[in-house]
Amino acid sequence: FNNSGLRWLWLTLVCLAIDQVTKHCVVASFSLYESVNVLPIFSITYVQNLGAAFSFLADQGGWQRWFFTAIAAIACIVFIVWLGKTPKSQTLLSIAVALMLSGAMGNLIDRALFGYVIDFLDFHWSGNHFPAFNVADSMIFIGAVLMILESFTAEHND
């Protein structure tokens, strides 16, 4: 445990807690599609995403709930195994995978409990809106960016 990336599971749990608490606060405080402008380019808008990224497949008959739930569950297993096999010395990679695990878990919890993902971070410019997203999505994105950076900086033995 201490000699692998699993020592970063605390980061996964902290980010997962932040994701779930923020989603709970939005659901408790907002009606569906209610929006509060925070900055000229940013609003908190409560949205239920039945699909994947950018609401992909959201208009299907309901099968996508179980499809995306299964994909998220498999991703969580892969990330946990990956952390377990990552040496302690690969800190940046471990952090990246821990963040992506937290995002996958956060959205998996939403899909399993509600059948949709709770999104609320809404960026917009000149009347154009970027698709709403959440803390879990942000962790997946940040983890992916860190993984790309790690691939450029790591010493690889080929």
Which residues make up each language-model segment?
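Alpha-helical transmembrane bundles and membrane-interface segments of multipass inner-membrane proteins
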Residues: F1-D158
